[in-house]
Amino acid sequence: MSFRKLTLAAAVAMAMGAPATVVADSEFGFGGTGTQASADLSFRIIIPDFVFFQVGTVGNGNVDRVDFDLNAGGVESGDGNAVGATGGTGDGADGILAVELRSNASNVSIAATGGNLTGLATAGNLPFADISASDGGTITVPDFGATVNLAAGPYNLTDQWVYSYDNTSVYAPDQYDGTVTYTVTTL
């Protein structure tokens, strides 16, 4: 076989094996003034489900604390008068925490989980149910141990959650510490 025939055979074989995806949309136009040619191009953007949730100080790993010190202001334990925050750390120092929720999901739920607050010296328990939380009406704060479903998304919401100690029960003198975990789940 001659070199010329071999080259032609190789070129034909390569052309037949070329994938169709390398061919772009095209049009040839010719003529006088106003001649046009156009080509179409399609786009695709793939966006996965996502959720961002923040309670308190901005930053991954920041855990704020809200303090209720019944020694401050001469509050009597168990007198039924609610106690506002008297200190804490980060955004929780005044008992008013910034909350932000962003998600492209059509529905989400927020759950509040945690055991009890445990006394450091007595190992006694103080239930989270003795702490009340309210919201500004944008992001519903769930009761401790409960879950709330939010209205249809997508969501780009901010709110403030305000905490107080109910002070309706009498507990042994101690410092009671505990952590509640708020979890947002896309549904």
Where are these regions (language model features)?
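Serine/proline-rich low-complexity intrinsically disordered segments, especially terminal tails, linkers
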Residues: 4, 105-111, 134-136
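Serine/threonine-rich, repeat-prone extracellular segments and beta-strand-based repeat modules
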Residues: 132, 136-138, 144-147
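N-terminal small/polar-rich segments of proteins
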Residues: 23-123, 142-187
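Bacterial N-terminal signal peptides that target proteins for export
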Residues: 1-8
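Hydrophobic helical h-region of N-terminal Sec-dependent signal peptides
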Residues: 8-16
